[in-house]
């Protein structure tokens, strides 16, 4: 039986136990996999040298389940701090008879509680959303510890996007400002996430070698596949973080309502 860590207060800016957040993450996982061109576009989906894989911050497990289904010979483990999301992921693994998909409740910012050399590939998406900037060195060293010699850590991060809508641009500016004030980004002014700018240095200092970077641009526009998913993701994200934005003094309830409603009109 998998051993779960007890839940403690975490740094995630969203409500990790929220059903709304669970639905948003499932939607976001589909959007990202589709927009990036598949589960492993950088490898042309060739995982012949991968036997054991870990997904850090797996949420409700959508990516893990997709990988486990596509690659039945690979053992895929997902960890997340949310007990509710892990229970959801386990239930779906059972329903889909995915015996190679495993899930555990764990805080990725603490010891990962796996033996050294456990995995061939460690995957993590949007780590900036739950990792204070001071925690990156220890987080990456822990990833290196559990990787086998020649193993891969695969990180996916995003930076701020631009839009033809001033209201959408304003919304997009608020998120890095929120993370900056929460101590999560490396930006000096909170105008962007910046994490990709410092990633190579962080990886090198943690002991990683053969560092490679693959830049991708995901088009989000009317008529483009995935547009409605992206709009829904934006809606739910900002509905959820609005109280925090106001509490931190980034905006006011009145300004938020005006900008948010204008953005909805602009993206219809």
Predicted features and spans:
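A short acidic, Gly/Pro-enriched loop at the edge of an enzyme's catalytic core
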Residues: 112-121
């Amino acid at each position: 039986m998998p051993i779960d860590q007890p839940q403690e207060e975490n740094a995630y800016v969203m409500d990790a136990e929220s059903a709304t957040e669970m639905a948003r993450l499932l939607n976001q996982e589909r959007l990202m996999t589709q927009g990036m061109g598949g589960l492993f576009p950088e490898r042309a989906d060739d995982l012949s040298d991968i036997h054991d894989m870990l997904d850090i911050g797996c949420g409700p497990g959508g990516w893990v389940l997709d990988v486990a289904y596509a690659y039945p010979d690979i053992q895929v483990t997902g960890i997340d701090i949310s007990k509710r999301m892990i229970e959801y992921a386990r239930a779906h693994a059972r329903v889909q008879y995915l015996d190679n998909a495993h899930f555990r409740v764990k805080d990725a910012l603490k010891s990962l509680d796996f033996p050294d050399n456990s995995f061939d590939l460690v995957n993590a998406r949007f780590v900036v959303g739950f990792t204070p900037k001071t925690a990156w060195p220890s987080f990456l060293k822990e990833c290196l510890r559990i990787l086998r010699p020649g193993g891969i850590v695969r990180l996916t991060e995003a930076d701020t996007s631009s839009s033809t809508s001033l209201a959408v641009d304003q919304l997009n500016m608020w998120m890095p400002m929120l993370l900056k004030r929460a101590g999560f980004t490396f930006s000096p002014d909170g105008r962007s996430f910046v994490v990709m700018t410092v990633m190579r240095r962080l990886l090198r200092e943690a002991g990683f070698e053969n560092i490679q970077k693959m830049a991708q641009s995901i088009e989000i526009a009317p008529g483009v596949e995935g547009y409605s998913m992206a709009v829904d993701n934006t809606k739910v994200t900002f509905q959820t973080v609005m109280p925090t934005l106001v509490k931190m003094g980034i905006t006011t309830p009145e300004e938020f309502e005006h900008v948010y409603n204008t953005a909805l009109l602009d993206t219809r």
